[in-house]
Swiss-Prot record:
This is Putative uncharacterized membrane protein YOL079W. The keyword Oxidoreductase does not apply. It comes from the Eukaryota. Keywords: Membrane, Transmembrane, Transmembrane helix. One of its GO terms (cellular component) is membrane. The chain crosses the membrane at residues 19-39, 50-70, 78-98.
Length: 132
């Protein structure tokens, strides 16, 4: 339950500071991807995933401020922002997928050595699966 607090706080901040609809939509997509893949009852988001999320949101908001004066047509602004939003969302999804495959957080169950062995086993299984 405590992990939902930063997300709700981030959403409130986005609603407050965002004046552009595409920026808010793109940020909301990234937050939803974060909520779906990074939060459940058994795992917590890793610092890498959370950092990627914050960087993506910052880039979306900054892009909307920088690009708006330079684009003459409103449609071009939407296309550029939508393209970057899709790319950032896909990047975030890949990082979450990478976290889920290789770096699961198993609190208090495994020692560091056992965790390293499991990491190697998972990597070998993944490579075998991809090759065959």
């Amino acid at each position: 339950m405590a992990m939902y607090f930063p997300i709700s706080l981030l959403l409130l901040l986005l609603i407050r500071v965002s004046s552009e609809i595409p920026t808010f939509t793109g940020s909301l997509i990234v937050v939803l991807v974060f909520a779906l893949f990074g939060l459940n009852s058994n795992t917590f988001p890793s610092s890498l995933s959370f950092s990627c999320l914050l960087i993506s949101l910052f880039m979306l908001y900054t892009m909307s401020i920088i690009l708006l004066p330079f684009l003459r047509f409103r449609g071009a602004y939407w296309v550029v922002l939508l393209t970057f939003t899709v790319l950032l969302t896909f990047l975030t999804f890949l990082i979450f997928l990478f976290d889920c495959l290789f770096f699961p957080l198993e609190v208090g169950l495994l020692s560091e050595a056992n965790s390293a062995c499991q990491f190697e086993e998972r990597a070998i299984k993944t490579v075998r699966y991809l090759l065959y």
